[in-house]
């Protein structure tokens, strides 16, 4: 029992800074929305539309680079720290190539925006302008993620938290300057949010690099003789590990986007209630997501040390802590769902629907916690391909079709509206949780030599 308590302390010490970093990132998006809304409703809508395109694109790159964390954790655990610098350099090359692709997609996103039904031309122009300003921050964001993954792979999660809050503090005044046109800068409105956010990502990257160069704990790995050129074999391995994670993230983001589109014809009350419940549940999701990042680090480190039993302990402890957290957040959600809904909107119909949907959200919080931590465990074992298959099957084969049938058809019951989609979420996330656990058990029952061989690839 003592080993599980000790492991839980280590996991929480790693996870809490990740939680705070995620809060800072969420707060940046909130600040952008509020400050653009203070300029005009059109600018706020433009930022919202631009963000809905930016997020899937940048999260794809983010997911691809998450492969670095278990690779570095495993090298650190095995004492092969001299190989870490080379992996990081290849990570920067990969980030550079991916950022060019993302920038090309975002530059041409105007075709998607203007194709939207009944969109106001002025709104479309502002959304395109916002994206074309923001896209210059894509390399900065992805380079920052490489540096952050280096630190987190070495079990240093506090730097990411500090840089997140530095970014938030810089974002507010820079937003103000470019939205309203102060200190000789042009008045750009919502487009100014894109300029500010792009600048902030570069500031965060440069601050993180400055920290890494000065950190005594990384003195032995931060330098490499000469300039490392792209190495196809290393980059191919990073892509093999990262692409399934990137696609899984993409499937998750697009699932919720598709559901939002399917709910939109049902009316203002249904859309508002759905959005409130979704926004609150996404805030709760920060907890298991951060714990999953910590579990990846611990499992990768233990496998690097050659201890499959300690890796199992880290995995089981992560799941136990995650279930405890999810139980507490579910009780909190059920107990205060009406009061939470009132913070967003005071329309009685909207509050009633949002409170009902939050009840369904509370039901899936434990499943959601298990599946996201399960994903973190599999990343630690470098078994990322299974994450892709499980996510696709659970979300797009089971969750979305069942939600659509329950919400919009009478094949099973009378059309349930948004609640049907939320039952679909429960089905999808519970299926994902079950499949993640089955895959984890399958991996852990392999002979230790095979597990360690797979982890050292």
From Swiss-Prot:
Keyword DNA damage: no
Entry's Gene Ontology molecular function annotations: antiporter activity; xenobiotic transmembrane transporter activity
Stretches that traverse the bilayer: 11-31, 53-73, 93-113, 127-147, 160-180, 189-209, 243-263, 276-296, 314-334, 350-370, 387-407, 418-438
Keywords tagged on the record: Antiport, Cell inner membrane, Cell membrane, Ion transport, Membrane, Sodium, Sodium transport, Transmembrane, Transmembrane helix, Transport
Membrane-side (Extracellular) residue stretches: 32-52, 114-126, 181-188, 264-275, 335-349, 408-417
GO cellular component: plasma membrane
Subcellular location(s) of the protein: Cell inner membrane
InterPro entries according to UniProt: MATE_fam, MATE_MdtK, MdtK-like, Multidrug-R_MdtK
A single BP term in Gene Ontology: xenobiotic transmembrane transport
Chief location bin: membrane
Membrane topology of the entry: Multi-pass membrane protein
Cytoplasmic side: 1-10, 74-92, 148-159, 210-242, 297-313, 371-386, 439-457
Record's keyword annotation contains Cytoplasm: no
Alphabetical list of PANTHER family matching this protein: FMN_FAD EXPORTER YEEO-RELATED, MULTIDRUG RESISTANCE PROTEIN NORM-RELATED
NCBIfam families to which the protein is assigned, alphabetical: matE
Function: Multidrug efflux pump that functions probably as a Na(+)/drug antiporter.
Similarity section: Belongs to the multi antimicrobial extrusion (MATE) (TC 2.A.66.1) family. MdtK subfamily.
Protein known as: Multidrug resistance protein MdtK
């Amino acid at each position: 029992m003592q080993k599980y308590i000790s492991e839980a302390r280590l996991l929480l010490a790693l996870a809490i800074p990740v939680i705070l970093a995620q809060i800072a990132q969420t707060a940046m998006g909130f600040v952008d929305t509020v400050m653009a809304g203070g300029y005009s409703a059109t600018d706020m809508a433009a930022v919202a539309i631009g963000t809905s395109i930016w997020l899937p694109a940048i999260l794809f790159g983010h997911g691809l680079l998450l492969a670095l964390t278990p690779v570095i954790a495993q090298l650190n655990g095995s004492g092969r720290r001299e190989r870490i610098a080379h992996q990081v350099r290849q990570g920067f090359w990969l980030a550079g190539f991916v950022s060019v692709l993302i920038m090309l997609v975002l530059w041409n996103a105007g075709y998607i925006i203007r194709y939207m039904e009944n969109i106001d031309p002025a709104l479309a122009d502002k959304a395109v302008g916002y994206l074309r300003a923001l896209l210059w921050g894509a390399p900065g964001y992805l380079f920052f993620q490489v540096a952050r993954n280096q630190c987190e792979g070495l079990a240093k999660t506090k730097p990411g938290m500090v840089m997140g809050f530095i970014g938030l503090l810089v974002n507010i005044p820079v937003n103000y300057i470019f939205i309203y046109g102060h200190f000789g800068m042009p008045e750009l409105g919502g487009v100014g949010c894109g300029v500010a956010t792009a600048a902030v990502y570069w500031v965060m990257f440069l601050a993180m690099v400055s920290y890494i160069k000065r950190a005594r704990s990384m003195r032995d790995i931060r330098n490499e003789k000469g300039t490392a050129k792209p190495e196809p074999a290393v980059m191919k391995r990073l892509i093999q590990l990262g692409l399934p994670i990137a696609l899984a993230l993409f499937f998750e983001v697009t699932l919720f986007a598709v559901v939002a589109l399917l709910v939109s014809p049902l009316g203002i009350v249904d859309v508002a209630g759905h959005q409130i419940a979704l926004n609150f549940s996404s805030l709760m999701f920060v907890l298991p997501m951060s714990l999953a990042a910590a579990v990846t680090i611990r499992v990768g480190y233990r496998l690097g040390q050659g201890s499959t039993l300690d890796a199992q302990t880290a995995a089981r402890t992560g799941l136990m802590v995650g279930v405890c957290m999810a139980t507490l957040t579910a009780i909190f959600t059920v107990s205060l769902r009406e009061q939470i809904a009132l913070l967003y909107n005071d329309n009685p119909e909207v509050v009633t629907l949002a409170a009902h949907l939050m009840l369904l959200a509370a039901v899936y919080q434990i499943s959601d916690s298990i599946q996201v931590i399960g994903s973190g465990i599999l990343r630690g074992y470098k078994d990322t391909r299974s994450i892709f298959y499980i996510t696709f099957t659970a979300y797009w084969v089971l969750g979305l079709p069942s939600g659509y049938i329950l919400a919009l058809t009478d094949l099973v019951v009378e059309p349930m509206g948004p609640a049907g989609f939320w039952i679909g979420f429960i089905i999808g996330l519970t299926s994902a949780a079950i499949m993640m656990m089955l895959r984890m058990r399958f991996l852990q029952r392999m002979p230790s030599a095979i597990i360690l061989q797979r982890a050292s690839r």
